[in-house]
A protein has these predicted regions:
Chain B
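Short, polar/flexible loop-turn hinges at active-site or ligand-entry regions and domain interfaces
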Residues: 76-83, 131-139, 356
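Short, conserved secondary-structure transition motifs
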Residues: 149-155, 245-260, 366-375
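Histidine-acidic residue clusters that define the catalytic metal-binding segment
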Residues: 5-26, 169-209, 241-247, 284, ...
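Generic structural signal for individual residues within well-ordered alpha-helical segments
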Residues: 121, 142, 189, 197, ...
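His/Glu-rich zincin catalytic helix
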Residues: 1-88, 112-115, 125-127, 198-305, ...
Length: 422, 437
């Protein structure tokens, strides 16, 4: 039987780039998701703010056009376009009407290949970034996330976060030259572009070839695999912040696992069984049975490119029930690992994930995101059809093997908020 | 969702009302349930939504947040779908891959499932069952109250949400838009189960609801299923409680301050605007886009490009009753609140005095054309947007409103700026960060 690939086609373009095109029934909707190599993991830790400053200013003027011309032309066509920075890549995401796709793609390529970061724009972007950092200092979720990453990882690891104060220092000392040096290494080798919606594959291919062919052939290269050097330890960190009505709590453990590892999908299913969706173990116990939280979630995080990631359990608790809630969370995590990894629970989760995958593909935006993600994960187009089979093929033995990677008695803990006086 | 197929059919027990741009409207003969169907036969996914015409505008002191708390209790089981028979919504739908949830807002409450289409029948059966046979029990209220309270607490952690509550509370002194959908903390904690049950019995009836289906399904089969399952219920006996409170005229600017430990400074400026179905709303929507939609908008260039603010947004709400047009700005470090307030008001005055350019008008219209196209991309976006028009009082606005936006002129924008963005009708809020102790 022919496998369903949702009308998607894959093309090699511009010597090193990959283009995925999927026409859908959406009228007047074109979704673009893409990325080039180049992110914070390509730079020394002290410069990890450069990619995000660069992403903010890619449309703020190029060698050929001023900011007002670029942004005005996009606005004239009703195009939305944003850039963002990750660990290994700089991403772009856009939406336009069908007739404007060639213009959108040429604008993206021009920004990636020619952004020149005017001094005044750099100064303003730094001021905004410092303002955002100030906000994050009292963000309970962000503070707990930073603390957990610092507990779990060695200081050189991509998943080790610097403090917000260190980030402030980096922002202040960033220069236009830093941004230009970073941007100059964007290249077409490693480019991934997914375009879906009211499109024709031939037209998209022609427009993409024309736009991105002007990028340099070589620049940033894929990064080598990394492994955390810090041993597991049941460390704890509390970050008190006054005047907060809610406490953010994180439990986690670094996993000796990459996305390409055979145990990745079993570990993903494990996390989903523990805390993915309302029917998961933690939601059914901590929220549904005990009423202790609005939400408790388990996810795999930090698996960017070649990076080994971690299991993260996140819950929010009322300060007045904090101690009781944390004890219940720890207990239910243990209970899950000892009694709830069963054939029946796995079968249910596999059915849920394969069904929700279909739902996720039902929009142009969802399809573009999945095509882009699979491609940067090193999968070919056939994987779009094969993914449900990969999930169905995961056995209970696989999931139990993945569970053994979690140092259950050495889970680390971070929490931030206004804690009760004990 | 491009090619919508208006395959009008006749199904016993229903009456065809009209067809508009591929959306078929029917009524269930026995109880008045409104049915909206939009078919895309090739889609492998279907979305189902029940919109109840009740929201936090139907609450009063003592049971603010009741609509939302009741929405949570609706997931605790019903006569034929419950924990005891192991047929909870999570077991029979989420574990099949369905996106299952519910949302509550000022004018409506909705329950929805987006799922592989073979499960549509299950969703219809379950929603029909809990429409009149939900378990509304004290033991569930006790455990769910703390869940909702934590949702409230999460919101309180967010400075923007805290300021927004204060602005609405000050802008509305009589009308129930005064309180936020989640309600006041003490009401969340203490509302009796009898009041929630009463709320359910007052509003959860077929003649106070609309069911919508979008995506891959057979119209005849779906209608037959709706007749079978929702046709079991009678219409409500007696009248619905009318929400008749009107907001008195505002006589002068109002000001609020929220001061808390932290590093975030915000300014919010709200002005009264008419109800969603009013003829001035299209021009007000275009006005809001010209003010703060995207990097070429007036306020973005004035506040964010200059690094006086980190971000800015302007939103013209479209509610059943007169509501607000609000601008929020998050201040950069050391920017005084007063400066941002003056610059926003200057931008308002500039439009009122000098109008907007044709370039600005065309950009706003192009932006909204792209946005409106995206509302038909997939079942959830479609259902969600249609649901807001149902709540506003007229689902056909989903089709007709884009045409009205196209007709807005520069003069219309200037006129509504003059008419509505006046200081006497404003409510200004400052969130002030206090030094951390």
């Amino acid at each position: 039987m022919k496998k369903q690939t949702y009308g998607a086609q894959a093309f090699s373009i511009v010597e090193g780039g990959k283009l995925l095109v999927a026409p859908t029934s959406a009228k007047d909707v074109v979704a673009v998701e893409g990325s080039v190599l180049g992110g914070s993991n390509h730079l020394p830790k002290r410069w990890d703010v450069i990619p995000s400053l660069s992403a903010e200013l890619l449309d703020a003027g190029t060698n050929k056009k001023k900011k007002g011309v670029i942004r005005g032309a996009l606005a004239d066509r009703g195009i939305s376009l944003s850039f963002s920075a990750g660990g290994d890549r700089t991403f772009f995401s856009g939406q336009c009407l069908p007739e404007d796709l060639p213009f959108l793609l040429s604008t993206i390529a021009e920004c990636l290949g020619g952004a020149h970061f005017p001094e005044a724009e750099v100064k303003a972007a730094k001021a905004r970034a410092l303002g955002s950092i100030a906000e994050l200092k009292t963000d309970t979720n962000m503070q707990a996330r930073i603390a957990l990453s610092r507990i779990l990882y060695d200081t050189a690891h991509p998943n080790f976060s610097r403090t917000l104060e260190e980030e402030e220092t980096s922002i202040r000392s960033s220069t236009r030259r830093n941004l230009l040096d970073f941007r100059h290494k964007f290249c077409r080798d490693g480019l991934v572009l997914a375009v879906t919606g009211d499109v024709n594959a031939g037209t998209v291919r022609k427009a993409a070839e024309k736009a991105f062919g002007k990028l340099p052939a070589k620049g940033f290269a894929p990064l080598a695999k990394q492994l955390n050097k810090k041993p597991s330890a049941s460390a704890e960190k509390l970050i008190p912040i006054p005047d907060k009505a809610n406490v953010d709590v994180l439990l986690g453990a670094a996993l000796p696992l990459h996305k390409s590892d055979p145990l990745f999908y079993p570990a993903y299913l494990l996390a989903e069984m523990l805390g993915g969706g309302f029917a998961s173990h933690l939601m059914m116990t901590i929220r549904e049975r005990d009423g202790l939280t609005y939400g408790v979630y388990a996810t795999l995080r930090g698996f960017d490119g070649a990076t080994d990631g971690y299991l993260r359990i996140w819950a929010t608790f009322s300060p007045e029930k904090y101690t009781e809630s944390v004890a219940a969370l720890r207990k239910e995590v243990r209970t899950f690992f000892s009694t709830s990894i069963t054939e029946k629970a796995l079968l249910k989760k596999k059915e849920e994930i394969t069904g929700s995958y279909l739902v996720g593909l039902s929009t142009a935006r969802g399809l573009a995101r999945i095509l882009h993600q699979f491609t940067i994960d090193g999968r070919d187009l056939a994987f779009l059809a094969e993914y449900p089979d990969y999930i169905r093929a995961v056995s209970l033995a696989h999931v139990r093997a993945a569970a053994k990677l979690v140092p259950l008695h050495k889970l680390s803990f971070a929490a931030s908020g206004t804690f009760p006086k004990i | 969702m491009a090619r919508r197929f208006a395959t009008r059919v006749t199904v016993s027990g229903t009456t065809f009302v009209r067809e508009l741009d591929g959306i078929l409207e029917y009524r269930l003969n026995t109880n008045g349930l409104q049915i909206l169907l939009t078919q895309d036969p090739n889609a492998p996914v279907a979305g189902f939504m029940v919109t109840y015409h009740v929201g936090s505008r139907n609450e009063a002191i003592g049971y603010t947040g009741a609509t939302h708390l009741l929405e949570h209790l609706m997931f605790k089981g019903s006569k034929n779908f419950n924990k005891e028979n192991k047929k909870t919504i999570w077991e029979i739908l989420e574990t099949k891959g369905a996106l299952v949830n519910a949302t509550t807002w000022n004018d409506r409450t909705n329950y929805f499932e987006v799922m592989p289409k073979e499960h549509l029948g299950t969703a219809i059966t379950l929603e029909a069952d809990r429409m009149r046979h939900a378990h509304i029990r004290e033991e569930d209220r006790q455990s769910e109250m703390t869940v909702v309270r934590n949702e409230f607490e999460r919101g309180e952690n967010n400075p923007m949400e805290a300021l927004d509550k204060q602005i609405w509370a000050l802008a509305y002194e009589a009308h129930p838009y005064h309180h936020s959908t989640i309600g006041w903390r003490s009401d969340i904690e203490k509302v009796p189960i009898a009041r929630l049950k009463q709320f359910y019995d007052d509003f959860y009836w077929p003649d106070n609801a609309t069911v919508s289906i979008v995506g891959g399904f057979d119209v005849k089969e779906a209608l037959a299923m709706i007749v079978k399952e929702f046709g079991k219920h009678s219409k409500k006996k007696g009248d619905y409680l009318a929400m008749y409170t009107e907001e008195p005229n505002q006589e002068g600017e109002r000001r609020a301050t929220v001061a808390r430990a932290g590093n975030t400074d915000l300014v919010g400026i709200a002005h009264k605007v008419p109800a969603a179905v009013h003829s001035d709303i299209p021009a007000l929507i275009i006005l809001a886009l010209i003010l703060a939609d995207g990097k070429t908008s007036r306020l973005y260039r004035t506040l964010v490009d200059s690094a006086l603010a980190i971000d800015v947004s302007t939103n013209c709400y479209q509610f059943h009753d007169p509501s607000l047009l609000i601008t929020y700005a998050t201040l950069a470090s050391r920017t005084p609140h007063q400066k941002i307030e003056e610059l926003v008001k200057d931008a308002y005055r500039a439009i009122a005095l000098k109008g907007v350019s044709s370039t600005e008008l065309n950009r706003a219209k192009r932006s909204i054309r792209t946005y409106i196209a995206s509302l038909r991309d997939g079942p959830y976006a479609f259902l969600s947007a249609l649901n807001e028009q149902i709540a506003a009082g007229d689902w056909t606005r989903f089709v007709t409103f884009p045409k009205k936006l196209v007709q807005v002129s520069a003069k219309d924008v200037q006129r509504v700026a003059r008419q509505y963005l006046i200081d006497d009708q404003s409510t200004v809020g400052w969130f002030k960060a206090l030094p951390q102790i």
